[in-house]
Amino acid sequence: MKISYSVWKDSKRLKKMSVDLADINIVKSVLARHGFAFSKSLGQNFLIDSSVCPRMADAAATDKSYGVLEVGPGIGVLTSELSKRAEKVVSVELDKRLLPVLHETLCDCNNVEIVNDDILKLDLKKLISEKFADCSEVTVCANLPYYITSPVIMKLLSEQLPLKKIVVMVQKEAADRFCAEVGGKNSGAVTVGVNYYADARLLFPVPRESFIPSPKVDSAVIELTLLDGKRVTPKSEKVFFNTVKAAFSMRRKTAVNGLSGGLCISKEAATAAIERAGLSPTVRAEKLSMEELSRLSDEIGKELK
């Protein structure tokens, strides 16, 4: 059952207090008081660095009239900063055990609403339409669990949502991939996917010590500014993304091998499509530009009929 939980609904029941969520001892005390234990399966690493959250909030809410959709508020450190800068903040949290924690830590934030649901299953068009009707623009700000980084970002980008930009904390390695140049040495399928919908840039690195518990890797904050239109216009988006996925599936081999294995077509058919697209039959996927991948997908589409 979906539970929409507004922080301000029952805030009068709590004694107003200032909670220093950047103090690890206070954080541990709050969590212990509510009997909360971190879940490895949910990838819970809560951001508590007082120097990071204001910078993320500044990037996401550049105007007081903005609405911000937050994914995974944790204990509310970033949420609190967003509430100071935005017209309204709606935070989607999967773990219902965090609701009473957030009720306490965000009791002074009258423009924050917590939605207890799975971001990957939500109808985001409906949510944005209902929750941000009075906001001039809508942005996304999130400290994403590493294991759902790509699915969440691609959902936000591909569903044609009325978003201005996405500011998100991800694993450093993933940040490098998202922000890589298509056709460069770090280019991958997710690089192409992101660049299809947005301009990506790395904002700043975040050390692992900024979280509780500390993960084993460092993170980085990236900004994805959505394009007004598409960067390329393949004949079929479905074929385009299937082509990209297949082409990058065997990074140490030529695109022919990836296309053949990933799309279940013969190497001869894959080679013919590559040559019709004006490309070398020995080309590797990571060397291809967006325009070349678009041309290739159009030719692959002919082989799939």
Regions inferred by a protein language model and the residue ranges of each:
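Surface-exposed charge patches
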Residues: 29, 257, 272
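Catalytic cores of RNA-modifying enzymes
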Residues: 1-242, 275, 286, 295, ...
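An accessory alpha-helical subdomain
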Residues: 220, 224-226, 232-269, 277-280, ...
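Mid-to-C-terminal catalytic subdomains of enzymes
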Residues: 283
